A protein has these predicted regions:
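Cytosolic juxtamembrane N-terminal segment immediately preceding the first transmembrane helix
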Residues: 2-35
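Extracytoplasmic
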Residues: 29, 35-54, 262-267
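Conserved small/polar residues in nucleotide/adenosyl-binding loops
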Residues: 282-286
């Protein structure tokens, strides 16, 4: 009995320490990386506002405006694996900086896009933004889990992702209010502001002291240790033949189709039916 009671303070101490969400030395990195979750949530939510705006300002069909979402997510599809390879070789910080640079450049490309009045040029800009966003997500999600005790990693990730939701809420209200309240409003304006802000954040990430949780050598060594015999080809075959994994991929694929389709075209359903104006629709996110 005495032995048990004697162990309790030590056990409780470990439990209290393990329950700390973020280590003290990682608070600043956690705040900076969490801000990225807000950034890409904001950027993705703007797409639904852009869809309706371009239909009105450029007199394009719903089918053609759907290329806004398609082009952005093609960037996700094509850049996902290269992003993982880059981060494995270079580390999390270079991955974040690369993602922010692509995002910022794509946003600033809206300026010449508006001068040219070319919808296709806007699509190229959105493709670059999509490439940047997937690099950001690939770097930030695993990095945020490493900034503290492993037992609290899910809580850290959930907290960071809540700011992603906040970005999704605010983007339609802010950008939709700008674009729909004034027919002559510049679509380049919000993207210019966002591009400058994102490039500023990239500069901060270049100079602020951030812990590189896993060095390049550690990541490569871990990947080599965990990889099955036969290399990448064997790993891919192992995944494809895993029924649970493929079922998960299929479920995510169907979920994304449903989510993106509803978010993209519900504004048309609500406004064309006369129930809401484009401006009042943006307030639904609140």
């Amino acid at each position: 009995m005495k032995e048990t009671l004697g162990e309790m303070p030590e056990s409780n101490g470990r439990r209290q320490q393990g329950c700390r969400l973020v280590k003290k030395e990682f608070v600043v990195p956690f705040v900076l990386v969490t801000s990225l979750f807000f950034v890409w949530g904001f950027a993705r939510a703007i797409l639904d506002v852009l869809n309706k705006h371009f239909q009105m300002s450029m007199d394009i069909t719903m089918t053609r405006s759907a290329m806004i979402q398609a082009t952005t997510y093609i960037g996700y599809f094509l850049m996902a694996i290269p992003a993982g390879v880059f981060i494995t070789r270079r580390g999390y910080r270079p991955g974040v900086v690369l993602g922010l640079l692509l995002f910022g450049i794509g946003s600033l490309m809206f300026i010449p896009g508006e001068w040219l009045g070319s919808f296709d040029f806007f699509l190229v800009s959105l493709f670059v933004i999509g490439c940047g966003l997937v690099v950001l997500e690939t770097a930030a999600n695993p990095y945020i889990t490493e900034l503290g005790d492993p037992s609290t990693a899910p809580s850290r990730l959930n907290l960071a992702q809540s700011f992603n939701g906040l970005g999704c809420i605010l983007a339609p209200v802010i950008v939709g209010g700008i674009l729909f309240s004034n027919p002559e409003a510049s679509v380049a304006l919000p993207y210019t502001v966002m591009g400058v802000a994102v490039l500023g954040v990239a500069v901060v990430f270049c100079f602020v002291k951030l812990p590189e949780i896993n060095s390049r050598e550690q990541i490569v060594a871990s990947a080599a240790t965990d990889a099955p015999r036969g290399g990448a080809g064997a790993a891919l075959r192992r995944l494809v033949t895993n029924k649970g994994f493929m079922a998960g991929v299929g479920a995510l694929f169907c979920y994304e189709i449903a989510e993106i389709s509803i978010n993209t075209f519900f504004i048309n359903y609500a406004t064309d039916g006369g129930w809401l104006t484009p401006v009042s629709y943006t307030h639904l996110t609140l």
